[in-house]
């Protein structure tokens, strides 16, 4: 049996998950990362994407996150998300609304740096939309 560790997924609204899991795949800013028990300590940024939680017996659950940070230790992983929801609860209209808000930010950007960051975030959101909600 695979070793487990404590995984917590926290958003500003609530604690979405806190339990023992076998592994978690997170969308790190430097690329996808699989976290398992006894992982080397690291802190990483999280980009918009899907978190896959694998429980004992290979049961899986997925969450959508819209940025944040993960604190990974040998004993566990705490992911503080800017916003998060279960994939099965994701609303196409809500995601489309978020994309339109970011498009407006791109259009209203007053400087190059702000526009570049908004365009990058918009690209991540539209990629996420295509992966999760095919037309």
UniProtKB/Swiss-Prot annotation:
CDD domains: F1-ATPase_delta (cd12152)
Gene Ontology molecular functions: ATP binding; proton-transporting ATP synthase activity, rotational mechanism
GO cellular component annotations of the record: plasma membrane; proton-transporting ATP synthase complex
Membrane topology: Peripheral membrane protein
Alphabetical UniProt keywords: ATP synthesis, Cell inner membrane, Cell membrane, CF(1), Hydrogen ion transport, Ion transport, Membrane, Transport
Compartments reported by the entry: Cell inner membrane
Family named by the database record: Belongs to the ATPase epsilon chain family.
Subunit structure: F-type ATPases have 2 components, CF(1) - the catalytic core - and CF(0) - the membrane proton channel. CF(1) has five subunits: alpha(3), beta(3), gamma(1), delta(1), epsilon(1). CF(0) has three main subunits: a, b and c.
Role this protein plays: Produces ATP from ADP in the presence of a proton gradient across the membrane.
HAMAP family associated with the record: ATP_synth_epsil_bac (MF_00530)
Protein name in UniProt: ATP synthase epsilon chain
Lineage: Bacteria, Pseudomonadati, Pseudomonadota, Alphaproteobacteria, Hyphomicrobiales
Gene from which the chain derives: atpC
């Amino acid at each position: 049996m695979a070793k487990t560790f404590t995984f917590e997924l926290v958003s500003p609204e609530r604690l979405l998950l806190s339990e023992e899991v076998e592994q978690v795949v997170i969308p790190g800013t430097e690329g996808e990362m699989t976290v398992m028990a006894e992982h080397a300590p690291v802190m990483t940024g999280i980009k918009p994407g899907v978190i896959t939680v694998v429980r004992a017996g290979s049961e899986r659950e997925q969450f959508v996150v819209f940025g944040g940070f993960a604190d990974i230790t040998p004993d566990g992983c705490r992911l503080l998300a800017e916003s998060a929801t279960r994939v099965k609860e994701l609303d196409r209209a809500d995601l489309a609304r978020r994309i339109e808000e970011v498009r407006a930010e791109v259009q209203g950007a007053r400087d190059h740096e702000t526009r570049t960051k908004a365009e990058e975030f918009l690209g991540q959101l539209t990629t996420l939309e295509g992966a999760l909600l095919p037309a």
